[in-house]
Each structure stands twice: as C-alpha cells, then as structure tokens.
Amino acid sequence: MNLSNLQPAEGSTHNQNKRVGRGEGSGKGGTAARGHKGAKSRSGYSKKIGFEGGQMPLQRRVPKFGFKNINRKEYEGVNLDTLQLLVDNGVITDSVSMTDFVANRLASKNEIVKILGRGELKAKLKVTAHKFTATAKAAIEAAGGEAVTI
C-alpha cells in the first residue's frame, strides 16, 4: 500500500446518495435531476392512488352498480341434518328452541335463526325458530314434529 492507492477498509463506507440541488458546481444543481416542469418536478409530489396521468381513471370509467339495503335481515341458517345430529348425540330430545341453539353455538342470542331444509330429519321435534323454509317446515311436520315461529 502506498499513497497512490489508498482506499477505505472493507465495509467501512456505505453507498451515499448524491446530494442534488446544491448548486451548479456539484454537477446536480439547476433542475436537480428532476427534468423540466411537470408534476414530478415539483416539491411535495406523490402520485395519487389510481392516478393515470390525467386520463379518466379506471375506477371512474367503470359504471356504478348495486346498493346496500339498510333494511336487510341477516339470518343464521341451521339445517335439518344439524338438528338430526344433535338428536343422535343425545343433546336434544323432543324440542329445540333459541336457548338450545345458543348453548350448542349454532347461533348467538341476538341472531335471527332460520331453519333450512338440507338433510333428513327422522326425529319428532318441536322446533322453535324465527323462520322456516317451506321444505324444512314440511320435513319437520312429515316426521311428526311441529314448527313454531317466534
């Protein structure tokens, strides 16, 4: 090593970015490598999400559709095969109501329960719920049970 080939130790220096906009003598003065005029040359520039250079953005070109019905009721569905499974496991015997749905985590206490017709119900049950589908009501009554609306 001699004075003609001095260099910093390995890993002691980091790639420092060139300081721009600090006078013509620095080599990066004037426009500070931003080019001439335009939005990108201005201070505080950041491209807005969805901005397409002034072209009408996709989000505004596509038509709007649909709406959220504020009066919509959200039902928690319980199928007949689930009720039959509870009977087979000995959890319920002759009747099932909201307290049973809550106890078996099929619905929470504030939810509206609707009995749906998937599966087969063999047990004679008195089912108490907020709503029934036509097929579910028919299946409960065909098994000798009773469908009671709250």
UniProtKB/Swiss-Prot annotation:
Q: Which gene encodes it?
A: rplO
The UniProt similarity line reads:
Belongs to the universal ribosomal protein uL15 family.
**Its domain of life?**
Bacteria
The protein here is known as Large ribosomal subunit protein uL15
Composition bias of kind Gly residues appears in 23-32
Polar residues bias: start-end ranges? 1-15
Organism, by scientific name, is: Flavobacterium johnsoniae (strain ATCC 17061 / DSM 2064 / JCM 8514 / BCRC 14874 / CCUG 350202 / NBRC 14942 / NCIMB 11054 / UW101) (Cytophaga johnsonae)
Which Pfam families did the record assign? Answer: Ribosomal_L27A (PF00828)
What are the protein's UniProt keywords?
A: Ribonucleoprotein, Ribosomal protein, RNA-binding, rRNA-binding
GO BP annotations of the record are:
translation
Iron listed as a keyword: no
Instruction: Please provide one cellular component term from the Gene Ontology annotations of this protein.
Output: cytosolic large ribosomal subunit
Subunit details for this protein?
Part of the 50S ribosomal subunit.
| PROSITE patterns per the UniProt record, alphabetical | RIBOSOMAL_L15
Q: Where is this region: Disordered?
A: 1-53
* Keyword hit for rRNA processing: no
Describe the task this protein carries out. Answer: Binds to the 23S rRNA.
The GO molecular function terms of this record are: rRNA binding; structural constituent of ribosome
Q: Which cysteines are joined by disulfide bonds?
A: none
